[in-house]
């Protein structure tokens, strides 16, 4: 059910309507799209565009600030959209995956913006890479960027900042715990209920398998998927986060 393609503005006119253009070499992989009636909704609060479908889903972005021609490294921009629990639509599942390194960072930023607008989902970023935040603000879409979730705040102050710090040990552990919990509950067969979890994006699964918490740089899809899961959390998990320093999410099996 996964389709590759790109999101484009209708007739090339920004801020109108986003369309999905199927392309076997497209940068996006998509397993589900919202019904036509809730796509491309332009909603404003206090004269600012905001995400209209935040109760349905959220996104996570592992961004970069330097153009590929300047940086030259292999790290990609990664992006996931995730559906929360819902009675009508696919629930507790990733519906979009993106891992690409366009030559200009702003192409990546605009890709994220178009998909977020099409779905109407807010996205959570790492605030140590602020290029994407500045871009969204310049385009009038900073209302689509989530503030730091309250349950991930280390202070009791009401200071609101876009995104979360990637160098915080509390955030790093919460991020890893969110992925481990998701895999346990929603990937493969749930031994307690017998239900089969659905995860359509093999590149993300492979990224989870190889993930090393002490060397997170190479695992772009793990970072963005974990940010989406953190964005979907309503409150701080009651279970104490595990120590992931010597842990893998998925065990490797040599047998076929």
PLM segments and residue spans:
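RNase H-like, metal-dependent nuclease domains and their acidic two-metal-ion catalytic environment used
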Residues: 1-148, 185-256
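Short alpha-helix plus adjacent loop in nuclease-associated cores
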Residues: 145-189
